[in-house]
Design a protein with these regions (language model features):
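Sec-dependent signal peptide recognition
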Residues: 2-10
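Boundary at the C-terminal end of the N-terminal hydrophobic targeting segment
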Residues: 16-21
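Active-site histidine-anchored catalytic micro-motif
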Residues: 22-298, 303, 316-321
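Long, Lys/Arg- and hydrophobic-enriched amphipathic alpha-helices
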Residues: 296-353
């Protein structure tokens, strides 16, 4: 009898642990990102002293595209954006990287949601916004799937959490991964999702930008032999040509008034299935960018608050930045940098004009 009792206790303990492990989304990358509050404070202070002193306006900022690379590479690109954001809740559109497609499923034509109660943060667990469950209940079931494993394997959303929580310890998030899909499918899904979000905002008297913010996670061109992507070669001249192409795309399609036609033209530059270009830069967040901007444009239109204007905050890459000399850090690097392996990244703020 005692053996049975002990066995039942063990089952209860294991079950309780299982429930908890499903309740809090665990950290995927504990090398490239900072998960210690004191160290994050020191890192922000370091960035305050080392970053460019150019100031960007917080007023009318409603959304942004953010880098998600290692902090020791991209800290100076994260910092000038995230110090502008202190909304109560943030919708984050993340990437569905190749690791997810290999380890979980080759997702296509859907948004990927999750069931966690919260995500790990630097101070405490970051709570999930009620918006997530509203999306599940109102969005057509064919447009999304729910998969905790996919979110556990993916790193492009968690990368933004330490910066978000540093500036607002009580921030809530709605994490959404965007799978590969056509522009037509994106328009179809964003039409429904934008209405769900605007209805939620109106019902809760939330102001876009101040109370609820939209973030799109992306790293720009992944260049070099490891990515099977070196159309210009592998020398300094090739590096310059590749970053100039990134910057051209940003300036032609993301800076200034962002209208649906510009978004569709951007898709022709960065989506392989839409493009007729000979050279297509390997932006890992290409699907979240197109989807997020189509949806954001609809939200701005439905709220009748003006036009969407993009402003480049900072562009760089791992080869240019090298490694930040932030001393006594627990952080490290998850990939090398060289002319044979480098990644571009940028932050852009979207304002109401």
């Amino acid at each position: 009898m005692k053996v049975i009792f002990n066995f039942l206790l063990l089952l209860i303990f294991v079950f309780a642990e299982l429930i908890y492990s499903q309740g809090v989304r665990p950290i995927r990358d504990n090398v490239g990102f900072c998960w210690n509050a004191d160290e994050m404070k020191n890192f922000i202070e370091y960035l305050e002293n080392s970053s460019d002193k150019i100031e960007f306006d917080k007023e009318n900022l409603i959304a942004a595209i953010s880098v998600h690379d290692d902090y020791l590479y991209a800290g100076n690109i994260y910092y000038p954006l995230f110090k502008l954001i202190n909304a109560k809740e943030v919708i984050i559109f993340g990437v569905t990287h190749g690791t997810v497609r290999k380890e979980v499923s080759p997702f296509t034509n859907v948004l990927i949601l999750e069931n966690f109660d919260s995500w790990k943060g630097i101070y405490n667990d970051v709570k999930i916004s009620p918006l997530r469950e509203i999306i599940k209940s109102k969005l057509d079931k064919k447009y999304f799937t729910v998969n905790n494993k996919a979110h556990e394997v993916e790193h492009s959303i968690e990368a933004l959490i330490p910066f978000l929580q540093f500036y607002n310890p009580d921030v809530k998030i709605t994490p959404i991964m965007v799978a590969q899909m056509s522009v037509e499918k994106m328009e179809e899904i964003s039409l429904q999702l934008s209405k769900i979000i605007t209805d939620y905002m109106k019902a809760n008297k939330l102001k876009l930008g101040k109370d609820i913010f939209i973030l799109i996670s992306n790293d720009a061109n992944h260049y070099g032999e490891d990515f099977n992507n070196s159309p210009y070669g592998l020398d300094l001249n090739a590096h310059q040509k590749a970053i100039e192409n990134d910057q051209r795309i940003i300036n032609e399609y993301l800076v200034g008034i962002v209208e649906p036609e510009r978004i569709k033209n951007l898709a022709k530059e960065i989506l392989p299935e839409e493009s007729n270009q000979k050279i297509i830069p390997l932006w890992c967040g290409r699907y979240p960018i197109i989807f997020g901007l189509l949806m954001l444009n609809r939200i701005v239109g439905e709220l009748k608050i003006g036009n969407l204007e993009g402003k480049l905050i900072k562009y760089s890459d791992t080869f240019t930045e090298k490694v930040l000399p932030f001393r006594k850090s627990s952080m490290g690097l998850t990939a090398p940098f060289s002319l044979k392996h480098w990644v571009g990244f940028f932050t852009i703020g979207f304002y109401i004009k």
